[in-house]
Amino acid sequence: MKSEIIAVGTEILTGQIVNTNSQFLSEKFAELGIDVYFQTAVGDNEERLLSVLKIAKERSDLIVLCGGLGPTEDDLTKQTLAKFLKRELVFDKTAQERLDEFFASRPTSMRTPNNECQAQIIAGSQPLSNKTGLAVGGLLEADGVTYVVLPGPPSELKPMVNKELLPYLSKTSEKLYSRVLRFFGIGESHLVTLLHDLIAEQTDPTIAPYAKTGEVTIRLSTKAHRQKEADSKLDKLEKKIITIDNLADYFYGYGEENSLPQVVFDLLKEKGKTITAAESLTAGLFQARLADFAGASDIFKGGFITYSIEEKARMLGIPFEDLQLHGVVSAFTAEKMAERSRQLTQADLAISLTGVAGPDSLEGQPAGTVFIGLSSSKRTMAIKVLIGGRSRSDVRYIAVLHAFNLVRQTLLSHKNLV
């Protein structure tokens, strides 16, 4: 289980107080075998806390927020988390009774609407009672992630953790297991639409989609006593997902840290194939990604960056008049770039990328138009990809992903194309 601790409070960032809560929680979690992967401090600001929660949700299974439960205007933790999860705040009866007792015993103390907020929890939460203060804590699960809300003062947090949170975590013999499925070539909204029925009916396991630049991931999460039990439940759900329409065509791998370039690199090594590339608009990004992996020299000997029309003719030997006739942004040029780079390096496969990164059009082609060529000893072909409404850097980045995906599809094809 990946856990993350978020300390909320501007006074932590300004150095007015030392964040001892995170150290205390990390120590206690370690005793339970819960790994703390991240610690974050954020000020009392809704927008910044929302951004931190968005990041935490994508990388952690257990998120613990400390602080921001008090009666002042800048105590926004519960309200912000409720907004993030699209849930309402509701009153906890026990916490309300504690408020009543507190002010009944102090008739001179003024009870304000802000005090009432201390007795609220997020709908669906399990309350964590506060024996040394007024702000109730809470624990809830949403989209495969467990959220815990704790008060900031150590005199309140420590008893709540020791008496409420730790017993809950330790007595829960079931652990949270997750599996990440990675998809390329399909948008998040389209994927969510296809999975609508499964998402609407989800209980355990749960399905949580995440959009990334150029791709989408789905985290499947379940609770189980052991890995084998979890795998059985996750296998069944994964099979349901992959068999919906043509989702299997977009699925390329597993894992939080995996990537399309990594999958292609592993496939090339597994099949003993070599690859080269000739790049125009991406200016070497495809080749750079290959070189990121140890052992790249086994499958990649070198390639070409032919940014201008002159270099396409000079380095690759493509007749200049042919390039002028067909244009550099064309299927013809993409095919010739791939074919010539393969012939010159004697690689098994060659990829080429030529197109319009933007923001201006080129040769009548709008920004985001990309032609990707692929050449093997069996055939040479090109595909056209439209990556509209993106920044120049995004167009180049996504174009490289499309190139890797084309290689992946070719290597996995049953038509013996390599």
From Swiss-Prot:
Q: Which InterPro entries does UniProt cross-reference here?
A: CinA, CinA-like_C, CinA_C, CinA_KH, Competence-induced_CinA, MoaB/Mog-like_dom_sf, MoaB/Mog_dom
The entry assigns this protein to a family as follows: Belongs to the CinA family.
Write the lineage as a comma-separated list. Answer: Bacteria, Bacillati, Bacillota, Bacilli, Lactobacillales
SMART domains from the entry?
Answer: MoCF_biosynth
Q: Which SUPFAM superfamilies match?
A: CinA-like, Molybdenum cofactor biosynthesis proteins
Question: What is the name of the protein in this document?
Answer: Putative competence-damage inducible protein
* Domain of life of the native organism: Bacteria
Q: Spell out the Gene3D superfamilies in the cross-references.
A: 3.30.70.2860, CinA-like, MoaB/Mog-like domain
